[in-house]
Amino acid sequence: MKKVCHLTSVHQRDDIRIFHKECKSLQHIYEISLVVADGRGDDVVDGIIIYDVGKPSARWERMILTTKRVYKKALMLDADIYHFHDPELIPIGLKLLKKNKKVIYDVHEDVPKQLLSKPYLNKFILKIISNAFKKYENKSAKKFTAIITVVPEITNRLKQFNDKTVEIRNYPKLNEFAKINVQWKDRENAMVYIGSISEIRGIYEMMQVAYKANIKLHLAGNFSTPALESDLQNHKEWQQVIYHGVISRDNVVELLSKVKIGLLLLHPVPNHLIGLNTKIFEYLAAGLPIIASDMLHYKEIIEVNNCGFCINPFDIDAIV
């Protein structure tokens, strides 16, 4: 049986796309291993072997030392195919190609556009970095065995450099939601947001909506920084938040089955203008109407199918 090794220096071991969709889908025909850097130790989960190279204490450590640890572990495992999920692992992927390995690059985000939204550098420098990375990614794309993308914009760009570029969208597994049997009218009059928690993903606006409407906001996921978590908890609006932490897939489904509204108030930064957030499909699968940002690709799904509203995410009064 051929061996496939997934590599990530950023994502958690129970990442939905990586572990639950890709690793589990492949394990029936391949021997699957997953290399992570989340600090939770080695493990075997559902027959998938997980190797942990240790959680970095800072971004610089992750970019420099963790990537080296991932590469060292990858070499030790001697897989037939390597499938990596983070742009910072591109150099690792290129090194593995030189070892005559097949290497797949899984592009979860439009990184050049994502870089334009980073808060810790000025716009001029960000534009230079974004353009430089785009050239580097395009050049590297030519060399990989295959590329997997999530949205047409990324697919169209990278397919110019590698014709083995395939788009696999991040849709939910509907069988996870089949057990929901709570009628909408019987659910708690509350809202929910599940996912990465950050300023550009609208956390402050969601809290303001909950506070002004005087209804609870159920929140689950990772905070982008400890400083953000601390700041949020010091706001008066936090009293309307019920924070569940990082929760399992079963608990995600359970939480979505208890509330009445799904929120997705993303800020209109470049990466959000093309990316299609998986949460809207999970909300719909759970029978939730959605309040989302007024971006065209969300309007085409939500408003056309009459399953919610798309509103300016900064207009709190209109949302309420």
Report residues per predicted region:
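Short N-terminal targeting/anchoring amphipathic segment
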Residues: 73-90, 101-104
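Nucleotide-activated donor-binding/catalytic signature segment of Leloir-type glycosyltransferases, i.e.
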Residues: 218-221, 229-254
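Conserved donor-binding/catalytic core segment of Leloir-type glycosyltransferases
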Residues: 5-7, 148, 184-218
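Membrane-proximal helix-turn-helix segments that form the acceptor-binding/catalytic region
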Residues: 22-24, 68-75, 95, 105, ...
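Conserved acidic donor-binding segment of nucleotide-sugar-dependent glycosyltransferases
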Residues: 304-305, 309-316
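N-terminal subdomain of nucleotide-sugar transferases
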Residues: 1-40, 46, 146-148, 152, ...
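Short hydrophobic beta-strand element within catalytic cores of glycosyltransferases
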Residues: 261-264, 282-292
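Donor nucleotide-sugar binding/catalytic pocket of nucleotide-sugar-dependent glycosyltransferases
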Residues: 51-52, 127-179, 186
